[in-house]
Amino acid sequence: MKKGRLYNRQEIEIISKSAIGKSVNDILNEEVVTIENEVSPNKGGLGQLVEQFLFGIQTNNDSEPDFMPAGIELKVTPYKKLKDGRLSAKERLVLNIIDYMNEYKNEFNSSHFWFKNNTIQLLWYLWEPNKDNKDLKITHEKLFELAKSEDLKQIEEDWKYIIKKIKSGKAHELSEADTMYLGACTKGENSSSLREQPFSKIKAMQRAFCFKTSYMTQLVRKYIGDYSNVEKVLKGTTNTFNEFINNIVDKYKGKTQKELMSEFGLESNAKNINNMLISRMFNVKSKLAETEEFQKAKIIPKTIRIEENGRIKESISFPYFKYTEIVKQDWEECDLKEELETTKYMFFVFKMENGEYVFKGIKLWNMPEIDIETSVMEMWKKTYNTIKSGNIVKSIENGIRKTNFVGMSENNVCHVRPHGRDAKDTCKLPVPDKLTGANEYTKHCFWINNTYIRKIFEEYL
């Protein structure tokens, strides 16, 4: 008979290891039971099935770890194989719901987050498309102990940032991209899943602590895949990531691009000179975006050049969207929302002064949740409706097509713009365009307005 939540640490390890190479169906066959007899077919994912049939844990929302008194939480989580052969987490690891009304009263080591998640028994399974969940196999297990993790200090910093925002009455402004590894992801069916917060009358979206998808991807590659060639930014230091960045700014702020190139021994005609400069600032040989910390936190480094008149050359765009895919999504789970809510940018700011670009500092930025849930949502929904209704082309004047896609003048944050090499670089449409009858149309993508980007750097103008 299964002990359920009463297994001790050694027993949990033995059972976890025994599950490797098995699917849920394999486990069910060993138990001589069928899913139909034990579980409603409409309830639970693979994780709940493993909890129930491997350990005998019934589905619950208990505030305690799954195994008491061992103090171990059980998490069953998927990873996938990318086209290039690399491994990636399929999703974030959702932990416990954030109790806005009480969590702020605690210190990190006495918090409900720590109590619930300081020791997690991870069971990884390989997700494969077009395969029934019950046939997916558990491939690896790992007892993840936060107290022993090299990321503990950063995770504590992330927790403190989330709590600071709650204490400031800004729980409604929380975004998963605010932090590095430990995020605050939305937890609810839709935007109407609102909760009271203690220091503001504005209700906030229900959120849960989570390990970000980018962080889980690095754990997958570390414990399952090949992680031998990943370079670290934080080498031989006890500093947090933010402390390290401040040291970089203090060291190089005020130096011209030419002075930095001379200091790092770089030629002015070298390709990707800006990428090489920012890598040297961080004392790494590889691309900064490919280092461990940047991949874990999903940080995109980008050089920003401000002209003497305040003009900013750089723009921010996203990969082209497939018309046939965008109409299959809804706003709450669309690719653009996911990207903006989980991505942080690290801007290296250079300003033109007396004919030379001078390094002014580093700005970590992610799009505020209020902008995502208003302007971006409006733009995305109009794009969705335009494609689905077949009303892409508005008019044709002198052979030039004008579309119904959102332009820069219509939205204060973002717009839609062509992304193809030329008019012949197209994607299939889900329904023919009504005006032209076309079944394909030029590739388009989402862009962040240059005027919006300029506001991000007002302190440097």
Model-assigned labels for residue ranges:
Residues M1-L461:
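Nucleic-acid endonuclease domains
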